[in-house]
Amino acid sequence: MHYKLLFAAAAASLASAVSAAGVVGAAEGFAHGVTGGGSASPVYPTTTDELVSYLGDNEPRVIILDRTFDFTGTEGTETTTGCAPWGTASQCQVAINLHSWCDNYQASAPKVSVTDKAGILPITVNSNKSIVGQGTKGVIKGKGLRVVSGAKNVIIQNIAVTDINPKYVWGGDAITVDDSDLVWIDHVTTARIGRQHIVLGTSADNRVTISYSLIDGRSDYSATCNGHHYWGVYLDGSNDMVTLKGNYFYNLSGRMPKVQGNTLLHAVNNLFHNFDGHAFEIGTGGYVLAEGNVFQDVNIVVETPISGQLFSSPDANTNQQCASVFGRSCQLNAFGNSGSMSGSDTSIISKFAGKTIAAAHPPGNIAQWTMKNAGQGK
């Protein structure tokens, strides 16, 4: 009953975000303490140029989005020759030859003409920013966001990022974090994205929380040519601690998430639903503790072989070892019409010592609650 009350409180607090001019709640897990723009007076951009200016200046900002900012075509178009490594069927993504990717890695793939648009380079977000959507009105279309080059203390809450060259791999990412610290992505919806929905780059990205967000993999185009987006969440930083809590990952086929570099990931109380392919991909330097998650209709929960380390909260007895650091046992994961998740590397638990750890709840009501409450406007 206690966890039901906690989730009810979270839902109520975000419902108030529909009318609130500012951030609601506080980050759980590793990004705890992030303040974004703090108490700065809210600003309301009305044009794409004004939005870019507010996001990129050096002032602490609380930026309220109350409309759709459509960047599609705002930087012109460029027709180039790309490639079709997954085939030329109508549902297959084709690839832009970015940084000679087609030439270097897919030289034998059929050549195709593709159109390069504004989505290739995301909007720069500088330090001390809160980007907050009003109800379901705050949408950034055709271009993503990037928190990079030392930017820190950023909150992205209750917005949607959509329609970034969905036909084209390398067409753009929804949210990029690289060489940063204290970033909270909360109640965000991403949909119809060309490449990664969320990517943490190879520099140190430090403390990041992604919570109560919807990664919607439905698309007319995919690398697997079946309407299930492949490029979900890629965590590749050199010194990263990432909390994934309460998110809804829907209709994907891979990289959900891909974890490597030197990344400590706490994946807790997420719903993985309707995957035609794999969810977790754990490479060298990926340290994953997964608890209280629900996997429903996920063909492959963890791609093998695992090159990193995984503690999958495998059974009640083993899960008691979490108490030495977490002050509680870890929660079992739940599986419905899905593959298995096997990983009992308890050495990962000690890596959480002294860190801010998100609470975990039993998986019983996670699916129902997450479908109702994760994403923009919920």
UniProtKB/Swiss-Prot annotation:
Gene3D superfamilies: Single-stranded right-handed beta-helix, Pectin lyase-like. The active site is at R255. It comes from the Eukaryota. GO terms for biological process: cell wall organization; polysaccharide catabolic process. Disulfide bonds join C83-C102, C92-C225, C322-C330. It is found in: Secreted. It is an enzyme of class 4 (lyase). Keywords: Carbohydrate metabolism, Cell wall biogenesis/degradation, Disulfide bond, Glycoprotein, Lyase, Polysaccharide degradation, Secreted, Signal. Glycans are attached at N128, N251. Residues 1-20 form the signal peptide. GO terms for cellular component: extracellular region. Its EC number is 4.2.2.10. One of its GO terms (molecular function) is pectin lyase activity. It catalyses: Eliminative cleavage of (1->4)-alpha-D-galacturonan methyl ester to give oligosaccharides with 4-deoxy-6-O-methyl-alpha-D-galact-4-enuronosyl groups at their non-reducing ends. Pectinolytic enzymes consist of four classes of enzymes: pectin lyase, polygalacturonase, pectin methylesterase and rhamnogalacturonase. Among pectinolytic enzymes, pectin lyase is the most important in depolymerization of pectin, since it cleaves internal glycosidic bonds of highly methylated pectins. This is Pectin lyase B. It comes from Aspergillus niger. The lineage of its organism: Eukaryota, Fungi, Dikarya, Ascomycota, Pezizomycotina.
